[in-house]
UniProtKB/Swiss-Prot annotation:
Gene3D superfamilies from the UniProt entry: Chorismate synthase AroC
Pfam families reported in the protein's UniProt record: Chorismate_synt
EC nos: 4.2.3.5
Protein name per UniProt: Chorismate synthase
Gene name per UniProt: aroC
Job description of the protein: This reaction introduces a second double bond into the aromatic ring system.
Source organism: Xanthobacter autotrophicus (strain ATCC BAA-1158 / Py2)
Binding annotation for NADP(+): R48, R54
Keyword entries, A-Z: Amino-acid biosynthesis, Aromatic amino acid biosynthesis, FAD, Flavoprotein, FMN, Lyase, NADP
Family under the similarity heading: Belongs to the chorismate synthase family.
Pathway: Metabolic intermediate biosynthesis; chorismate biosynthesis; chorismate from D-erythrose 4-phosphate and phosphoenolpyruvate: step 7/7
Length: 370
């Protein structure tokens, strides 16, 4: 299996399976002399960690991260990067592979069982193996390192829709996001989602969600035309997340309903004499290059395919059969996708920052003369 690495200069390679001994990643291309602490990485992982509420899988994984290489202890505390590959390891401790014994030969509808088998002629049926969302913990660890490449930049995510219930954007409050199990920025939507997901969970079913990401403080100029577009790389990174089925940047598909007057972001000079956009329909990216405005992206996640309802399928011998999935699963995988989406955005931004610096050096001076 190839394609376990993403990025150009800031490169992340992940390894491991859901029920293997461990999962991990190697971060290559990270600049030297960046300070961070193990607690920085652990805090990011804890936001994604399973089993923290009744609305996520009850698999109990502490997700304790170990740094194996690429750092030295800093005299003032914490660690400092050396510029060599940074290896991060997370041991798996709560696997229950016996839950999957009955489906070893049959394909679960909606999962990657059939496609892995038809491509490789073999698959790891234990919790989905390499295709499991368990792998995303490694991306979160890598994202915590990527964040150190971009001081002054913030990346935040929130769930904005679960099933048919969407937040009221007039009540958006980032301070509310860590105060509920849904990463929800609208406090009045929280009880609605609680009631809704309780019903979904008790029925043994699942539901999809939409996650919104906002990056602020991103320097103008990151990204490159035509095949190195920042939004294209961001979309690719987000679609690489398990269960992701769609991505929007800025207005996204809604832009198809707008007129040119409505969609184009007008510009004036701000208080510091630099261009300022009066709106942000573009989502902070024009021509594949960051404008300096907040970068706004959304990605949609399908319902978890592991449900208790019996489903029709076929097995490896070509026989029709019926299947239902045991094990522990998220009733809404979109909830824990928030820190994963943030991490992928961090990695893409760090990569483009290093690529931009390598090509043009410091940011181009503005205004232009003559």
């Amino acid at each position: 299996m190839s394609f376990n690495t993403f990025g150009h200069l800031f490169r992340v390679t992940t390894f491991g399976e859901s029920h293997g001994a461990a999962i991990g990643c190697v971060v290559d291309g990270c600049p030297p002399n960046l300070r961070f602490t193990l607690e920085d990485v652990q805090a990011a992982l804890d936001r994604r960690r399973p089993g923290q509420s009744r609305f996520t899988t009850q698999r109990r994984e502490p997700d304790q991260v170990k740094v194996l290489s690429g750092t030295l202890e800093h005299p003032e505390g914490g660690l400092v990067t050396t510029g060599t590959p940074i290896a991060l390891l997370i041991e798996n401790v709560d696997q229950r592979s016996k839950d999957y014994a009955d489906i070893a030969g049959a394909y679960r509808p909606g999962h990657a069982d059939f496609t892995y088998d038809i491509k490789y002629g073999i698959r790891d049926h234990r919790g989905g193996g390499r295709s499991s969302a368990r792998e995303t913990a490694t991306r979160v660890a890598a994202g915590a390192i990527a964040a150190k490449v971009l001081p002054g930049v913030t990346v935040r995510g929130a769930v904005v829709r679960i099933g048919e219930i969407e937040i009221d954007r007039s009540r958006w409050d980032w301070n509310e996001v860590p105060n509920n199990p849904f990463f929800c920025p609208d406090p009045k939507t929280v009880p609605l989602w609680e009631e809704y997901l309780d019903a979904v969970r008790k029925a043994g079913s699942s539901i999809g969600a939409v996650v919104e990401l906002v990056a602020e403080g991103v320097p103008a100029g990151l990204g490159a035309p035509l095949y190195g577009k920042l939004d294209a790389d961001l979309a690719s990174a987000l679609l690489g997340i398990n269960a992701a089925k769609g991505v929007e940047i800025g207005e996204g598909f809604n832009a198809a309903q707008l007129t040119g007057e409505e969609n184009a972001d007008e510009m004036r000079l701000g208080n510091e004499g630099r261009p300022q956009f009066l709106s942000n329909h573009a989502g902070g990216i024009l021509g594949g290059i960051a404008t300096g405005a907040p970068i706004v992206a959304r990605f949609a996640l399908k319902p978890t395919s592991s449900i208790l309802t019996p489903r029709q399928t076929v097995d490896r011998t070509g026989q029709e059969t019926e299947i239902f999935t045991k094990g522990r699963h998220d009733p809404c995988v979109g909830i824990r996708a928030v820190p994963v989406g943030e991490a992928m955005m961090w990695c893409v931004l760090a990569d483009h920052f290093l690529r931009h610096r390598g090509q043009v050096g410091e940011s181009v001076a503005w205004p232009f003369k003559g």
